[in-house]
């Protein structure tokens, strides 16, 4: 594989010295870019775009042509794994995901297959291989998956949810069924992420989008426990280099110490967390990723730069910070805002790495 020209992102995740703070954006390949909309229209629909390795590669590379980002992230969806389990995933126009066959009982859980990443999910691996080739070693490629808890919320609710009543009912009334589902999902995610690493992903990230809806003890039992299992099962070195893993629970600021205990290399922070406080709490153990409120990108350039400076100052001197948004970029931000953001991170972070 190609030698990396810019490994700032990988070094920061391992808390090794860098010349400036690396930056990328969650959902950086997406609807805020006009060229993405054109490629998606060419594909026909969202899952067709995910399943076409050349088009998935194209949308992965689009933001890198505009902005000086320090990493590329595979263009895919967290719901590829449950889709490969046969739940009948669809995306209606202007709607969120829907499953035709949501999980309601033990028999369904028992009958769920663990997908083979090189057969049912081969289209994802083909995309990873294609992207890695086309990146030509410019920046590292991040692979990813949803967390078992987050995947389970969609599988049990049948789609997106605001109250999570079905899965919480299962959690409190039939916890054994939910644990069996989460265990199967953890095994599936381990296979899936390891296959991405073998195909060329140089770092991986687990998105626990809905972990923050859980009560304190339930978070540890139903979300963190299974992310810990994943961390334990991952390939941590490939191509003669460490493969860092980042765990991100949206709304997870209460549990940073517990997340850091899993053995992950980095913890993602949403925008509700004070990064200075987070570094005091867990910075001796893990790198931190985040954590500007994505809505700041609606502001004037000076305001964006001010926010960047405040977060950089909050983290302070030295490596161990990957700058990012606290969640995915919004689709209607002004076109120049991401450039202002990325350039500000690079310009104003140099002083913290002398």
From Swiss-Prot:
Coiled coil residues, start to end: none
Gene Ontology terms, MF aspect: uroporphyrinogen decarboxylase activity
Protein name: Uroporphyrinogen decarboxylase
Organism taxonomic ancestry: Bacteria, Pseudomonadati, Pseudomonadota, Gammaproteobacteria, Pasteurellales
This protein's UniProt keywords: Cytoplasm, Decarboxylase, Lyase, Porphyrin biosynthesis
UniProt organism field: Actinobacillus pleuropneumoniae serotype 5b (strain L20)
Family, per entry: Belongs to the uroporphyrinogen decarboxylase family.
Enzyme Commission number(s): 4.1.1.37
Catalysed reaction equations from the record: uroporphyrinogen III + 4 H(+) = coproporphyrinogen III + 4 CO2
Keyword Magnesium in annotation: no
Quaternary organization: Homodimer.
HAMAP family: URO_D
Pathway: Porphyrin-containing compound metabolism; protoporphyrin-IX biosynthesis; coproporphyrinogen-III from 5-aminolevulinate: step 4/4
Localisation: Cytoplasm
NCBIfam families (UniProt xref): hemE (TIGR01464)
Sites where the protein binds substrate: 27-31, 77, 154, 209, 327
A single GO cellular-component term on record: cytosol
Function: Catalyzes the decarboxylation of four acetate groups of uroporphyrinogen-III to yield coproporphyrinogen-III.
Marked site positions, Transition state stabilizer: 77
């Amino acid at each position: 594989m190609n030698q990396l020209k810019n490994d700032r992102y990988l070094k920061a995740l391992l808390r090794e010295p860098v010349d400036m703070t690396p930056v990328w954006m969650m959902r950086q390949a997406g609807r805020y870019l006009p060229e993405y909309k054109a490629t998606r229209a060419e594909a026909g629909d969202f899952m067709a775009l995910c399943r076409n390795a050349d088009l998935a590669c194209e949308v992965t590379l689009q933001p890198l042509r505009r902005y000086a980002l320090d990493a590329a992230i595979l263009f895919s969806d967290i719901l590829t794994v449950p889709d490969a389990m046969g739940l009948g995933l669809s995306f209606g126009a202007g709607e969120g995901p829907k499953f035709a066959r949501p999980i309601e009982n033990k028999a369904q859980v028992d009958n769920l297959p663990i997908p083979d990443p090189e057969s049912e999910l081969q289209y994802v691996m083909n995309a990873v291989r294609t992207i890695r080739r086309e990146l030509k070693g410019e920046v590292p490629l991040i692979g990813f998956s949803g967390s078992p808890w987050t995947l389970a919320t969609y599988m049990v609710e049948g789609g997106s949810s605001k109250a999570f009543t079905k899965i919480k009912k299962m959690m409190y009334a039939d916890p054994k069924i939910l644990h069996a589902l989460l265990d199967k999902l953890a095994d599936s995610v381990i296979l899936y992420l390891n296959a991405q690493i073998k195909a060329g992903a140089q770092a991986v990230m687990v998105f626990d989008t809905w972990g923050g809806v859980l009560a304190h003890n339930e978070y540890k039992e139903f979300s963190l426990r299974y992310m810990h299992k994943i961390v334990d099962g991952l390939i941590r070195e490939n191509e003669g280099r460490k493969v860092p893993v980042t765990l991100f629970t949206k709304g997870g600021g209460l549990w940073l110490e517990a997340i850091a205990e899993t053995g992950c290399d980095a913890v993602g922070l949403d925008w509700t967390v004070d990064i200075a406080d987070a570094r005091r709490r867990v910075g001796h153990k893990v790198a931190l990723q985040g954590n500007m409120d994505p809505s700041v990108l609606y502001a004037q350039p000076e305001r964006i730069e001010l926010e960047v400076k405040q977060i950089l100052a909050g983290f302070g001197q030295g490596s161990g910070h990957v700058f990012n948004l606290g969640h995915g970029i919004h689709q209607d931000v002004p076109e120049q805002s991401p450039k202002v953001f990325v350039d500000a991170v690079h310009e104003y972070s140099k002083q913290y790495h002398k």
